[in-house]
């Protein structure tokens, strides 16, 4: 009898083991459902800090979403949000290649990026211009930009969307405020990173708005994004002796110019900076020399939500600024749109999900930003609240919150 029961016992043990394995595997399988949001931008090169900060902000947002239960898909199942971020090195060709690689993935519904305007413009150019146009073979993939800020780019394609502030509105308001509050400032000198699309475009806005505010534009100095010597340009400023110097430059060359201004004893009555330089990178690089500089920005840690977002980014060794603040909010917005529009996030629903995401982004009239409500325009741009910050004692302080907000 003992010999006859041994096979039966072994069989029962094997069945029990198989059932236990199945039961243990079931939760693991359930947890494997993911929604992947891709990003791309500059993670190397001179402006790499912006891409690195965007990636960190996106991952911090995803972490908050996952801790709260993840994303609810169209079939009611829960999915984990995963971020994958590609490096385009602020290079147009690499940006195009990055977006094509993303669009070729069977799990890619939408992407965030890029960092640089000189990448965004050609990238938007490969997208289908008018959604549903069978004669247009352009890429049919929704792109929600967080950083690239050159004006008007989203109108290039109905698949392109941006969550960047209007620098035209920001510098118009700033120059009007300077005119009203600083009657002693009458002359203007500009400095610009001549080889960078964003710097060039914004400098033209600064100069035009300064002229409209009644300031006398006396000239400009030019340098390149990768330059490290600015003695000639600062000598030009010194000879001009203007009341205001406006620098349309990113933190790296802004600090280089400010240090050279200190060395040569150039002390204008007022310093104005580029939106992108309203960052901790500027203060870490040249807080003493940047003392007093005024910059318009669409981010400052002045609301509970903004403080929370900044702390989440800091936990991943990143600083929050107007650019990656947008990257963070883009992730929360996409999570909401996935749920409201019942996206399935499966390979067999890929094209339908992309179309739903495009239509959802296009239909948005308003989103919630870190400083308040953000309006959406018909050409897929954002109307964001902003304020003016000033560098004081190694920190950014709010100088003014314009009434236009």
Predicted segment positions?
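Extracytoplasmic "Venus flytrap"
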Residues: 38-59, 86-92, 115, 191-201, ...
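Segments of small-molecule ligand-sensing domains
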Residues: 315-324, 335-398
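Bacterial N-terminal signal peptides that target proteins for export
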Residues: 2-15
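Extracellular/periplasmic periplasmic-binding protein-like sensory domains
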Residues: 261-331, 339-342, 391, 396-404
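Extracytoplasmic ligand/sensor domains, especially the bilobed periplasmic-binding protein
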Residues: 108-220, 269-295
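Beta-alpha junction/loop-to-helix N-cap segments that form part of ligand/metal-binding clefts
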Residues: 49-56, 71-153, 163, 223-230
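Short, polar/charged alpha-helical segment
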Residues: 50-74, 204-211
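Sec/Tat signal peptide C-region and signal peptidase I cleavage site
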Residues: 24-30
């Amino acid at each position: 009898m003992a010999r006859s029961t041994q096979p039966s016992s072994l069989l029962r043990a094997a069945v029990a083991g198989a059932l236990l394995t199945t039961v243990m595997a079931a939760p693991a399988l359930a947890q494997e459902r993911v929604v992947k949001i891709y990003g791309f931008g500059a993670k190397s090169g001179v402006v790499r800090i912006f891409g690195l900060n965007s990636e960190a902000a996106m991952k911090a947002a995803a972490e908050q979403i996952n801790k709260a239960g993840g994303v609810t898909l169209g079939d009611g199942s829960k999915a984990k949000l995963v971020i994958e971020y590609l490096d385009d090195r602020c290079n147009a060709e690499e940006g195009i290649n990055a977006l094509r690689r993303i669009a070729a993935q069977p799990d890619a519904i939408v992407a965030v990026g890029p960092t640089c305007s000189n990448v965004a413009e050609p990238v938007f150019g490969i997208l289908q211009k008018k959604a549903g146009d069978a004669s247009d073979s352009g890429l049919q993939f929704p792109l929600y930009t967080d950083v690239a800020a050159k004006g008007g780019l989203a109108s290039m394609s109905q698949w392109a969307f941006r969550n960047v502030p209007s620098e035209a509105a920001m510098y118009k308001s700033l120059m009007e405020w300077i005119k009203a509050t600083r009657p002693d400032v009458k002359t203007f000198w500009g400095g610009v990173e001549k080889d960078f699309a964003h710097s060039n475009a914004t400098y033209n806005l600064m100069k035009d708005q300064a002229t409209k505010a009644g300031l006398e534009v006396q000239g400009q100095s030019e340098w390149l994004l990768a330059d490290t010597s600015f003695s000639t340009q600062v000598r030009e400023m010194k000879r001009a002796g203007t009341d205001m110097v406006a620098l349309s430059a990113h933190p790296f060359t802004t600090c280089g110019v400010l240090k050279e201004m200190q060395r040569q004893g150039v002390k204008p009555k007022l310093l104005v900076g580029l939106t992108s330089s309203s960052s901790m990178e500027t203060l870490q690089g040249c807080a003493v020399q940047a003392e007093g500089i005024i910059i318009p920005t669409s981010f400052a840690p002045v609301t509970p939500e903004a403080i929370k977002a900044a702390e989440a980014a800091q936990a991943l060794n990143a600083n929050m600024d107007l650019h990656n603040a947008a990257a963070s909010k883009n992730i929360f917005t996409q999570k909401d749109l996935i749920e409201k529009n019942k996206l399935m996030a499966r390979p067999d629903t890929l094209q339908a999900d992309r179309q739903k995401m495009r239509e959802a982004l296009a239909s948005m009239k308003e989103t919630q930003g870190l400083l308040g409500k953000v309006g959406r325009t018909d050409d897929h741009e954002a109307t964001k609240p902003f304020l003016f910050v000033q560098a004081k004692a190694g920190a950014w302080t709010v100088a003014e919150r314009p009434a236009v907000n």
